[in-house]
Amino acid sequence: CKETFDIDADLVAKATEQADRAQETFENQLQLRGRQVLENVHEDGGYAVVIASRPYHNDPLVNHGLPKLFSERGIPVLTPDAVPGVCNVDLSNSRIDIVNNYHARMLSCAVIVASTPELELVQMGSFGCGHDAYLTDEIARMMGEMGSKVPMMIKLDESDVAGPMGIRVRSFIESVNRRRAEERAEGARVHAVHPLDDPY
């Protein structure tokens, strides 16, 4: 560092330590906020939506305002990192050999959403990403085997036409509301949640 950037090594070490602390603080606050959202929707009898996606989908120009389509209707939106326990899910019964953290978080969210009454799952994909093809199938399989929830998969492209996406979101919300109403009518908050068996 000193030779290349004229920065002392001890200064770099201190800066790195501060950055690690800041990152840890941010992650703790994000998890805390996620727990608060879950508590609020539980008390209100509602639900939140977890949008499982890749980092570039945080850009409104890429996601075309999808999170806002839920929040405008009073449905809170969580990112995978804000879902309590997302780093502690046992994925040994997944059919996929997990090769990166993004895949792990999406699959972990599927397991958590399937077993949490106050959560629903939306997966965003772009540009026909090859990995998303089998991730989508595995997310649907895992959630289907564990319970009655069906995730929404929405493929985004370069078009900014909002109409079709709005229709998809409204249809998804209506399906979720109908399923939840049927479950309440049966006297249960959710259908039975089954453990994920060994797929082989």
Where are these regions (language model features)?
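An N-terminal assembly and electron-transfer interface module characteristic of large anaerobic redox
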Residues: 1-200
